[in-house]
């Protein structure tokens, strides 16, 4: 059985311009600074999203296992969003879409991974709800982290 998942998560960053949110979300090498509960290590190409930019990632949720995966940007349109493919413990892809909303910036991740980590793949038929909660936990850490990071670096208007 394939361990296919589909998640759509939306973050709101109060007072932030989407250009600033895009720049933060787009620089994966910086994720451990503001999303460190989830992104333990990220190595790869520096700079903004662009086709061909790659990153190697070690991540985790609240469950006691880690995931090793790589991402490659396949399309980028600053500040509207970017699309990526992934391989490793995750296969598939995702797309970040950003938009201005009243009072700040909104970032939506449409994430469609197939999990290839053997034990997760084997246990998905029974533990899918728990793995979904693990994803929700990870995304909540990201939402909290980016809001605080943007506040600290002055991403809110004066």
Region locations from a protein language model:
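Hydrophobic ligand-binding cavity/cleft-lining segments
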Residues: 1-50, 156-158
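Amphipathic alpha-helical protein-protein interaction surfaces
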Residues: 17, 27-30, 78, 103, ...
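Solvent-exposed residues in well-ordered beta-strands and their adjoining turns
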Residues: 12-15, 58-62, 99-101, 112-116
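Hydrophobic/aromatic beta-strand elements that line small-molecule binding cavities or substrate pockets
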Residues: 9-11, 44, 69-75, 93-100, ...
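Glycine-rich portal/gate segments that line the openings of hydrophobic small-molecule binding cavities
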Residues: 42-90, 106, 140-158
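Beta-strand/loop substructures that line and gate deep hydrophobic ligand-binding cavities in soluble
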Residues: 85-140, 157
């Amino acid at each position: 059985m394939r361990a296919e998942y589909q998640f759509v998560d939306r973050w709101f960053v109060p007072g932030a311009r989407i250009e600033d949110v895009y720049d933060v979300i787009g620089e994966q090498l910086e994720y451990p600074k503001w999303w460190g509960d989830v992104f333990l290590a990220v190595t790869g190409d520096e700079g903004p999203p662009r086709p061909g930019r790659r990153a190697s990632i070690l991540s985790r949720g609240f469950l006691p296992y880690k995931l090793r995966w790589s991402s490659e940007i396949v399309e980028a349109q600053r500040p509207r969003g970017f699309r990526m493919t992934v391989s490793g413990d995750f296969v598939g892809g995702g797309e970040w879409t950003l938009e201005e909303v009243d009072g700040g910036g909104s970032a939506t991740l449409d994430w469609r991974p197939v999990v290839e980590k053997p034990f997760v793949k084997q246990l998905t038929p029974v533990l899918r709800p728990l793995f979904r909660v693990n994803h929700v936990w990870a995304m909540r850490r990201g939402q909290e982290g980016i809001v605080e990071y943007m506040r600290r670096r002055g991403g809110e208007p004066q």
